[in-house]
Amino acid sequence: MNISLSDHFTYKKLLRFTFPSIVMMILTSIYGVVDGVFVSNFVGSEAFASINIIMPFLMILGAIGFMTGSGGSALVALTFGTGNEKKAKEIFSLLVYVLIAVGFLFTVGGEILLAPMARLLGADEILLPYCVRYGRIILLALIPFMLQNVFQSFLVVAERPQLGLLITIASGLTNMILDAYFIAVLRLGVVGAAAATAISQSIGGLIPLLYFIFPNRSRLRLGRTRMDFSALLKTCTNGASEFMTNISMSIVNMLYNWQLMRLAGSDGVAVYGVIMYVSFIFAALFIGYSMGSAPIVGYHCGAGNKSELKNLLRKSFRLILTFQIILTIVAEAGAPFLAGIFVRYNMNLLDMTVHAFRSYSISFLFMGFSIYASSFFTALNDGFVSAVISFCRTMIFETGAVIILPFFLGVSGIWYSIIAAEFMAVCLSLFFLIRKAKKYGYT
């Protein structure tokens, strides 16, 4: 059964249409986790901690890819909804070309700033060499990494989410196989982990680039375009929430690492690394659903179909609530197994990780609502509200909690901070959904 953006969506259609995006994001997260598993088990906790220290800086550099993908896909979907296909294709081409140019500049700047940033983020003389070796190789694939994040969204707009899933599977399997070979067989350590990731990201970014360069049967193809500053500005505005989410999360991760180095040392950073890797997989379900459903919302917004917007919002929130309950139960029950994948070689570290993860996992009861609400407003081309939700969720609520709560609860306060932040983000999301209901007509 073919599903198009203009359809009326039942639960079955909604899940079928978003399923490739959900699986794609979960697999992407799992493939990223493989680096951590191999490094932790074959290289050691210090190398594992070093990757967690430098990763926020690398994610900040790549955040523009998430912004362009989410903001640009919303704009292109809305333009398709108005019936202007030529304009939609021109915007798509412009965004890809600009992203490649910006990616080159960021790669050069990242290589220059890598070592100073590692020191600033808390790397000592033991961890610094690991950070630099890992980061330099990852930066070589920064442009493909950005393109991968952009094309994940645009393949949905092109009504080819299955292709995006296949590319993600190919990229991820490459990462897993090369991780095993480079780290477990050749014993290349963090260099092997970085090389495996860089190669897999290149596959994930370059294959869809070639797909859109050559003639294809989708709605999109790269071609001639012209500079359109209003489209660039609208893309940045629409994608500001995703950009701020990635920037803010990276800054918050830096703060977590700093607090944990102060209160628990490198073992604390390793524990947080385990929690983050597992949390990425769980959050990927919400992100994948939001990413997969956003073009539908954008299309019906552009077409002025308010009844379908109401239908999409209500069904989505019911699905998100179901996901949240299931993930929380899985996290609480499976904490020993999930932690053991990374640190079973150290029982003290394992016990510490299980305790921390069970505290942290309560946040999954709230996490999905704010992620979807932010994406929903991005799809409506209301980038301001989307950015406010994302910025407050991480940069204000979580930062404030991780600074304040440890004064009263010690290390436990660090794990509880995410729960407080996610709950406040849900309240803020509900406020904006109620306030904007009349404007967009989804009540």
Residue ranges and their predicted role:
Residues 69, 138-156, 167-175, 193-206, ...:
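Short runs within selected transmembrane alpha-helices of multi-pass transporters and secretion channels
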Residues 21, 25, 37, 41, ...:
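Transmembrane alpha-helix boundary and packing residues in multipass membrane permease domains
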